Amino acid sequence: AVYEHDARREDRRVDVPGWRLGQATSLDAAIAAHMEQTERAFALPSWETRLDVPPWMRQIALVTTLHGMHYTGFIFNDYARQLEILRWMATQIVPERVLVFLSSWDGRYYWDYPNYTVPARMGGDAGFRRLITEARKLGFKMMPMFGTNAANRKQPVWSSIASGATYKIDGDLYNINWVDWNNDRHQDAWLTYMNLGADAWRNHLEGRIADMIERYGVDAYFLDIVGGHVNSTTGDMHEGTKRLVENLRTRFPSVLCVGEMPYDALHGFIPVYHAGNGARWHKYSRFFQHLSAPAAGRGSSGVHEWGFSRFNTETLGLSPAAIPTLQVVDDTFTKYRDVMAAIIARAKSRANIV
């Protein structure tokens, strides 16, 4: 067993928690014992009793991921095209049963983190406002994406949020340096991993999310990499994440928080994710499929850095453990509308929608 002290503390004395050794007849039994303690410690509610799930979310039968602008600046679907797609989808399924995930709505994927402003090339303020307003009039629920813990040091805002960077317990600055964004065969390191336990970063991100909710009236917000907990010297990341979510929930009680992937304690205050959908976690939360899942045709991952993988024409890429998810990249609507219709039909069948 290993105990790691809170990195933000410089205690001269450490009292290590006591360990209780037990015996279980199976892995599932051992996990069940762990989860009983976790449920008590972090107040994990069951899905059926959650108060942080708006009624509309319980009726969602389909999630569609509309891919926006790639890191390179290539645009898969601008705001006008996204609205055109949704208007067509409204002829295929009741829009109230659809959650629309707007990935990279805010400019170049990750490069423009953490500005979260509406880029002119995608259609500007007027185009984004029209997309949200008209889509919501149809009945769709709209959810833009935000990075929980990523900021580009080359953006002008960096000096005001730099104190929110993550430093690991050994003092190392933690950079997001594992992606080769420009395909030059070297990982790029202009992103720093940020810590919501630090006031400067949490206040910035909370302010940007709140502004988008107030300005455009979106129904939900998505926290990218929210499950990437790090024991940081600059603050308690878990408590900072919880504080951000609870602050926004207090201000906007009808707006849903969705995370990319969970760790066990996150289920206490985030009810929906798009990764980590093992059966045991359905007791607490619901899931849809990752934005990197291959789209119909070439199997593009859209804005995500993965690239390409095979699209399964038999399963249509749908997981039995997740809310059916429709990926829309640059050629999906023009070349593979029949596959879109087939995915929508399966989602309707699974939800018993006539």
Segments predicted by a language model, with ranges:
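Active-site-adjacent "subsite" loops/lids of carbohydrate-active enzymes
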Residues: G127-T133, P144, T148-D211, R215, ...
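Active-site-proximal loop/turn and secondary-structure-junction residues that shape catalytic pockets
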Residues: S104-D106, T148-N152, V226-H229, M261-A265
